[in-house]
Swiss-Prot record:
Domain of life: Eukaryota
Assigned GO CC terms: chloroplast; ribosome; small ribosomal subunit
An annotated GO BP: ribosomal small subunit assembly
Keywords: Chloroplast, Plastid, Ribonucleoprotein, Ribosomal protein, RNA-binding, rRNA-binding
Subcellular location: Plastid, Chloroplast
Cross-referenced CDD domains: uS7_Chloroplast
Record's keyword annotation contains Chloroplast: yes
GO molecular function: mRNA binding; rRNA binding; structural constituent of ribosome
The protein, known as: Small ribosomal subunit protein uS7c
Annotated gene: rps7
Amino acid sequence: MSRRNISKKRFPKADPTYNSYLVSLLVTRILKSGKKNLAQNIVNSAFDIIKSKTNEDPLVIFEKAIRNASPVVEVKARRIGGSTYQVPIEVSSFRATNLALRWIIQYSRQRVGRTMSIKLASEIIDTANDIGNTIKKKEETHKMADANKAFAHFRY
């Protein structure tokens, strides 16, 4: 076992434009090869597109999308007696938010479109309206956990 101190979890600072911690998490998730300025421009233009399409505050829509995409339970592989079981476990709020962000970005990258900001805006709007691939992924995760409910007593 390590004798060193356990490092504290570091959180990014709030986004300067929207003063939101969630937006800064989104920017760091979109980040590729250290180009943070480009990632910030993508998020800002995506939020402008959301504002023009819905005539609502993009931050409110983004938070609603995160709430809609956050899973409550997930399955984890657990090896017991030579066989591996998919054990359903509850997801912490921090992990649920991170999974939602990861799925939104993953499915916005897979979308067919012109620019990343347009694809990201479309995925956020769809997720806020409870449609799209991100919501399908969440429901699929919940179905997997429901199907393996019999192994819930193997929880750790």
